[in-house]
Amino acid sequence: MASKSSITHLLLAAVLVSVFAAAAATGPYCYPGMGLPSNPLEGCREYVAQQTCGVGIVGSPVSTEPGNTPRDRCCKELYDASQHCRCEAVRYFIGRTSDPNSGVLKDLPGCPREPQRDFAKVLVTPGHCNVMTVHNTPYCLGLDI
C-alpha cells in the first residue's frame, strides 16, 4: 500500500500538470497567424469607412442583404476571433500611432485615418458588434496606443 506522503506527492503532481495544461491551452497567443487570422478584421475596413466618413472603399463588395452588410461581416470577424484575442485584433487593426505604416486602416480620399482609428476602438461595444473580450465585457481597455 502506498504511503500517505506518496499519495500527497502524486496528487500535487496531478494538480500541477492540470494547471500547466490549462495555462498552455489559454495562452496569450494573439498575433496574426497565431491566434488571429493573418490579416485580422480586414472585413471591418468598409464598415469603419462608412461609419466614420460616409464613404465606401473602391473594390469592396456592396451589399445591403441581411447578414452580408459591412457591419455584419465585421462583427462576424470579431465574433470568430477567440474572446481573449478580440482586443488584440482591434489593436492590430487600428495600428500604432507611433508607426503610421502599421495596422489595416489607411488614409482614404476624404477620410483620414485618425477618425477611423477612433471609431474602430468601439467596434466591440454594445452599440456595434457587442462581443465579449478578454475583460469579460464588451469593451477593450487601453487602446490609446
UniProtKB/Swiss-Prot annotation:
GO cellular component term of the entry, any: extracellular region
Gene3D superfamilies per the UniProt record, alphabetical: Plant lipid-transfer and hydrophobic proteins (1.10.110.10)
Entry-linked InterPro entries: Allergen/soft/tryp_amyl_inhib, Allergen/tryp_amyl_inhib_CS, Bifun_inhib/LTP/seed_sf, Bifunc_inhib/LTP/seed_store
Subcellular location: Secreted
SMART domains assigned to the protein according to its UniProt record, in alphabetical order: AAI
Main location group: secreted
Tissue specificity of this protein: Developing endosperm.
Signal peptide: 1-25
Keywords for this protein: Alpha-amylase inhibitor, Protease inhibitor, Secreted, Serine protease inhibitor, Signal
GO molecular function per UniProt: alpha-amylase inhibitor activity; serine-type endopeptidase inhibitor activity
One Pfam family recorded for the sequence: Tryp_alpha_amyl
Function statement: Alpha-amylase/trypsin inhibitor. It could be involved in insect defense mechanisms.
Family: Belongs to the protease inhibitor I6 (cereal trypsin/alpha-amylase inhibitor) family.
Other facts noted in the record for this chain: CM proteins would be involved in the cooking quality of pasta.
Entry protein name: Alpha-amylase/trypsin inhibitor CM2
